[in-house]
Regions:
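An alpha-helical repeat/solenoid feature that recognizes helix-turn-helix modules
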Residues: 1-32, 40-153, 164
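TPR/TPR-like (Sel1-like) alpha-helical repeat modules
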Residues: 20, 158-159
């Protein structure tokens, strides 16, 4: 392929890592390239770019802002942690989760919007459950003693969107 997104690549990395752990044939170059790509998508301040472009998107209210990458931050950190990337420490995971909860209203606004990326910071409805799924995964990468408190915060956001 000639184009990929940070979040689709991040979804594949843990599967490749697990396949390798199970003894399945995994092309090391493919895995290393995927990890490198996601690492390159990470920006100072914790945001994760949607994709890598020769000409970056304009800064500000961009999809590549922390507020526009709340879900991508979680899946990227989870994937890179599973791949044992040294840059994803517990503190990096905690900071991204804090951003997730601090700016959650931008996911809330986008949740029921019918047109992708029409909400603030180009958030899309399809990122809502995606973001929560991978927040749960990355919480499980933290020390066990911390997980219950993080999951409790996450559950509150999922419970509020459940129907009777």
């Amino acid at each position: 392929p000639t184009w990929s997104t940070s979040f689709s690549t991040s979804c594949v990395i843990p599967a490749l890592v697990r396949a390798k752990e199970l003894g399945w044939a995994v092309d090391e170059k493919v895995l290393a390239r995927a990890v490198r790509y996601v690492e390159q998508c990470k920006l100072p301040g914790g945001a994760v770019m949607y994709d890598i472009r020769p000409i970056p998107r304009r800064p500000g209210e961009s999809i590549d802002n922390v507020k526009g990458s709340l879900g991508r931050m979680q899946v990227a950190n989870w994937a890179l942690r599973r791949a044992r990337s040294p840059g994803v420490t517990d503190d990096v995971i905690r900071a991204a989760l804090e951003d997730f909860f601090e700016h959650h209203q931008f996911l809330d606004v986008a949740r029921m919007r019918p047109i992708p990326h029409e909400a603030y910071y180009a958030n899309a409805a399809y990122f809502y459950m995606f973001a929560h799924c991978y927040a749960a995964q990355v919480i499980n990468e933290l020390p066990e003693s911390e997980r219950a408190a993080w999951h409790k915060r996450l559950r509150a956001h999922l419970a509020k969107v459940q129907w009777d």
